[in-house]
């Protein structure tokens, strides 16, 4: 009977995971169709439905593990990927509700889709199984520290991807800023406007502002996550900072986005230069989250690839 229940629970989890991935994949296609055919509002509504469905199923998967095993499911790579996928979809829905712009979904849905695909189809099955918590993780700081860090990653990834999109769309165009931080066109030596399409200019301005706002929201979460991690480390290992690879790259991530926010204050750095910094931050976030774990070294290497 116990084996039967375990198999049934595994099948339900597997179905929920597959449906979540399919929903996110469909939403990604729908968002791209909305970009291609702006007047087809049906695609946008259906995309919202699919993202909401995936979000609810991810809540179920996380809540089930939490209730069954009596600790919040953030103890290994698989569980953190589920939580990151949920964070991405939740933040996407909140930002779309707040800013009313389809570009957010078009950017966020591919990340959440690929993140969930990695957890579902690329991680070996043994890494998806629940294992007993090591003593250092048996703390209330597990929920506080890891969840806040992953939420910050979700915001920073979406914001930095928008900056990358800004760079792709603005290449070969010279852009200036007004006093209100709005993009304006620049002219060449013949006084011919480099950027002639006013709609494209408005689009670039929207993307740039969205990126700035979202990264501005994610940075405080990253700061709180690092501070809470330092406090937890002192309780668990007797030291606030050990220059562990994960700690070091978290600090590098913080510095990169601090530089980005500082460049937004300096008018000469706004636009493409600040977007380059944010684009570099996109890579650094993934190195901090996944890349460091391939080393298999340090205090944060448990429950990951080795």
From Swiss-Prot:
InterPro entries: Cyt_c_assembly (IPR002541), Cyt_c_biogenesis_CcsA (IPR017562), Cyt_c_biogenesis_CcsA/CcmC (IPR045062). It is found in: Plastid, Chloroplast thylakoid membrane. GO terms for cellular component: chloroplast thylakoid membrane; plasma membrane. The chain crosses the membrane at residues 17-37, 41-61, 77-97, 103-123, 148-168, 214-234, 241-261, 275-295. One of its GO terms (biological process) is cytochrome complex assembly. Keywords: Chloroplast, Cytochrome c-type biogenesis, Membrane, Plastid, Thylakoid, Transmembrane, Transmembrane helix. One of its GO terms (molecular function) is heme binding. It is a multi-pass membrane protein. The keyword DNA-binding does not apply. May interact with Ccs1. Belongs to the CcmF/CycK/Ccl1/NrfE/CcsA family. Although originally identified as Cyanidium caldarium, these sequences derive from Galdieria sulphuraria. Required during biogenesis of c-type cytochromes (cytochrome c6 and cytochrome f) at the step of heme attachment. NCBIfam families: cytochr_II_ccsB. PANTHER family: CYTOCHROME B_B6 PROTEIN-RELATED (PTHR30071:SF1), HEME EXPORTER PROTEIN C (PTHR30071). This is Cytochrome c biogenesis protein CcsA. It comes from Galdieria sulphuraria. The lineage of its organism: Eukaryota, Rhodophyta, Bangiophyceae, Galdieriales, Galdieriaceae.
């Amino acid at each position: 009977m116990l084996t039967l229940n375990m198999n049934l629970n595994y099948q339900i989890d597997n179905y929920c995971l597959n449906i979540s991935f399919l929903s996110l994949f469909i939403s990604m296609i729908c968002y791209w169709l909305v970009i291609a055919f702006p007047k087809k509002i049906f695609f946008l509504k259906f995309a919202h439905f699919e993202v909401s469905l995936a979000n609810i199923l991810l809540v179920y998967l996380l809540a089930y593990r939490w209730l069954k095993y009596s600790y919040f499911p953030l103890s290994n790579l698989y569980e953190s990927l589920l939580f990151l996928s949920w964070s991405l979809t939740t933040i996407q829905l909140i930002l779309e509700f707040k800013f009313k712009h389809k570009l957010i979904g078009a950017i966020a849905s591919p990340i959440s889709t690929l993140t969930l695909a990695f957890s579902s189809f690329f991680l070996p099955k043994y890494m998806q199984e629940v294992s007993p918590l090591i003593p250092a993780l048996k703390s209330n700081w597990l929920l506080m520290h890891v969840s806040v860090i992953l939420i910050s990653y979700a915001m920073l990834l979406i914001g930095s991807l928008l900056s990358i999109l800004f760079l792709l769309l603005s290449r070969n165009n010279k852009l200036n800023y007004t006093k209100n931080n709005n993009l304006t066109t620049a002219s060449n030596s013949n006084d011919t406007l480099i950027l002639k399409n006013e709609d494209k200019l408005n689009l670039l301005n929207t993307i740039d502002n969205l990126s700035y706002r979202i990264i501005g929201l994610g940075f405080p979460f990253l700061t709180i996550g690092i501070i809470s991690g330092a406090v937890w480390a002192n309780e668990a290992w007797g030291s606030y900072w050990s220059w562990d690879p994960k700690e070091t790259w978290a600090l590098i991530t913080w510095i990169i986005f601090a530089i980005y926010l500082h460049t937004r204050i300096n008018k000469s750095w706004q636009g493409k230069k600040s977007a380059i910094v944010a684009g570099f931050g996109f890579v650094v976030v993934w190195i901090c989250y996944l890349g460091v774990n391939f080393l298999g070294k340090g205090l944060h290497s448990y429950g990951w690839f080795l």
